Amino acid sequence: MLSSTAAWAQIETQRIVEPIPQINTQNIYRVSADRTPSGFAVPRYVSLKFTKVNARTGPSRDHPIAYQYQRRGLPVMIVAETEMWRKIRDISGDEAWVRKPALSGSRTVIALNPTSLRKKPKADAREIARTESNTVLKLESCNETGWCEVRSEGGFKGWTRKIDLWGADL
């Protein structure tokens, strides 16, 4: 059984914007890659590069730190960007600004519930391992039938349903 301490941690949580409903990709305004400073479309998922990442109320070091993420590899969604700053949204719906160097293009996801990793992308395929809720997994790929291939920190690699993951819907 795979286990994980809290997949994310915050110091002094503070709501920065109005409450955000569950992520619904139909309600996300997409900006094409040719219209962003990075050359990548927004929104998109990335992960935290460091164990500690300061999240600020605005896109500069002059803005106060709202909270600090304490989980390397945590998936976040970029919802806006400037040349050096990215506005991110986490699994809780909180939004804050972080510096571009604190983010990695490596794709990770969070298991929303205890999740089976299966040998093949089928519900009746052999179970290889189980994860607990809030486990961060590396996203390898997703297929058109709603299954994603993921890898655990312990090296287990298998398939799980896309709907059981946060960070795989774009």
Predicted regions and their residues:
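Short, small/polar residue-rich loop motifs at catalytic or cofactor-binding pockets
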Residues: D62-H63, A123-D124
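SH3-family beta-barrel domains
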Residues: Q10-T57, Q68-R72, V79-T82, R86-K119, ...
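N-terminal signal peptide c-region/cleavage motif recognized by signal peptidases
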Residues: S4-A6
